[in-house]
Amino acid sequence: TTGVLWIAIVCAVVGVVLGLRQRPGPVAWWGPIGLGLLSLLAAPFGSGDHLNYAAYGRILVEGGDPWSESPIAWGNGLDPITSAVEAPWTTEPSVYGPFVTLLQGGAAAVGGTDLRLVVMAWQVLIVLAWLGVRAGLRMVLDREHHGRIDVLWTLNPLVLTIGLLGAHVDTIATALVVAAVAALSRWPGPVGIVAAGVFTGLAAGSK
């Protein structure tokens, strides 16, 4: 399995390099939006981190402290959401910042006791963040570079598998960092500095 994974990674890197050499044009917005919607039809894969996110959000909305209480200890290990967490994270309290934990709580509030619905609500946030990075980069970079954005981010196999389809929290942190850069680019002066500071703080409060 490890060998296959490394082969896939090498192929992805080669594909990105070849894509950059072709000087590609930008992809129409309907493509990434459609891809994002399709990603919601399948559960995240590659790791069980999305189950951790669901559990910490569940603990938060139920009045607990996800930074001090472990998933396995919550609800005597019988809670339909927290009991789904996989080893070795069953005994680990949250290591995530307050902002992203609030987002996890929002997903948990939407899904209630339905694990798939909680995870899907989280996936919606990931899709929005993934699209947000694309929008932010297009805002900062000249139009001639928009095709490169799609090669390096939107259609990058590593980003798609780990960030989008894996539903990792890093996608949200990345979106916030890009938003900070876009704010400085869009609003020079005090407004941009303040906005960038807010987005940077939120990124730091994610992971």
Per-region residue spans from a language model:
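Short hydrophobic alpha-helices at membrane interfaces in multi-pass membrane enzymes
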Residues: 150, 179, 183-201
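Multi-pass, polyprenyl lipid-linked donor-dependent membrane glycosyltransferases
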Residues: 124-129, 148-179, 183-184, 206
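Transmembrane-helix signature of polytopic, membrane-embedded enzymes
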Residues: 25-30, 137-158, 187-188
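Transmembrane-helix motifs of polytopic, lipid-linked glycan transferases
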Residues: 11-19, 117-144, 174-175
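Transmembrane helix irregularities
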Residues: 41-46, 155, 201-207
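Membrane-integral, polyisoprenol-dependent glycosyltransferases
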Residues: 1, 41, 100, 106, ...
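Start-transfer (signal-anchor) and selected internal transmembrane alpha helices
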Residues: 1-41
